[in-house]
């Protein structure tokens, strides 16, 4: 079974179809914002209801919104710092097959930093000054369910940045590794089961595996 691709038969928005993001006053001045994969209009409304510009806004989206709300999506892209999408979505949004060319086109739409996820083949980070970083995926013997891996990746990425207070490219490189490490746990069991059971020591152990993978020479 190829878990790097999906065939979406139908998308039902259900309660999210008319979701109105109400932000409590105490949360209206965050330093870091993660716009999850909801409609571009919800994402835009969320930003408009903040009373202070965040240090960093990270956004996730998917091909569904490119199909039905492209203009709204482009409006949100103008207001975010980092976009995270997969390789198929990057090609659709940019109209370019080469991911390097796709990154250039997408960054011109607004987000100065772009993350392109490639499933079991890792992730690419394109920086605001033309920098590029590749983080491999950890080879796993068993992959139970990839659902939620992208959300986990994004959470690990921005969570690391928020914990350090940094937004520079070097910090983002480490954030990519944290996101990849957590996502590698997510796919090992269904839902949040695995993530709910791991400890900080488990995360450190997996980070060590990533460092070994990225530095070991033949």
Question: How should these model regions be labeled?
Answer:
Residues 1-34, 49-53, 204-218:
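Conserved N-terminal subdomain of the carbohydrate kinase-like
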Residues 20-21, 44, 66-70, 96-100, ...:
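Structural motif corresponding to alpha-helix initiation and N-cap regions
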Residues 37-42, 62-66:
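Short beta->alpha connector loops
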Residues 32-35, 58-60:
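Short catalytic-loop micro-motif centered on adjacent basic/acidic residues
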Residues 99-218:
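Conserved phosphate-binding/catalytic region of the ribokinase-like
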Residues 13-18, 61-67:
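Short gly/ser/thr-rich secondary-structure transition/capping motifs
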Residues 23, 73, 143:
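Acidic, amphipathic alpha-helical patches
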Residues 48-56, 64-134:
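Conserved phosphate/ATP/ADP-binding segment of small-molecule kinases
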């Amino acid at each position: 079974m190829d878990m790097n691709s999906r065939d979406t038969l139908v998308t039902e928005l259900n309660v999210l179809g008319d979701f109105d993001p109400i932000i409590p006053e105490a949360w209206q001045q965050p330093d870091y914002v993660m716009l999850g994969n909801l409609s571009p209009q919800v994402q835009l409304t969320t930003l408009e209801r903040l009373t202070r510009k965040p240090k960093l806004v990270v956004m996730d989206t998917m091909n569904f919104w490119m199909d039905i709300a492209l203009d709204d999506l482009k409006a949100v892209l103008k207001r975010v710092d980092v976009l995270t999408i997969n390789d198929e979505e990057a090609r659709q949004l940019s109209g370019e097959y080469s991911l390097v060319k796709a990154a250039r086109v997408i960054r011109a739409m607004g987000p100065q930093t772009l993350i392109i996820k490639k499933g079991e083949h890792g992730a690419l980070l394109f920086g605001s000054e033309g920098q590029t970083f590749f983080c491999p995926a950890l080879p796993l013997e068993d992959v139970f369910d990839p659902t939620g891996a992208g959300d986990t990746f994004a959470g690990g990425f921005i969570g690391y940045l928020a914990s350090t207070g940094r937004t520079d490219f070097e910090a983002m490189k480490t954030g990519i590794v944290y996101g990849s490490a957590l996502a590698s746990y997510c796919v090992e069991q269904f839902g949040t089961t695995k993530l709910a059971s791991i400890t900080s020591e488990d995360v450190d152990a997996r980070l060590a595996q990533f460092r070994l993978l990225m530095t070991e020479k033949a």
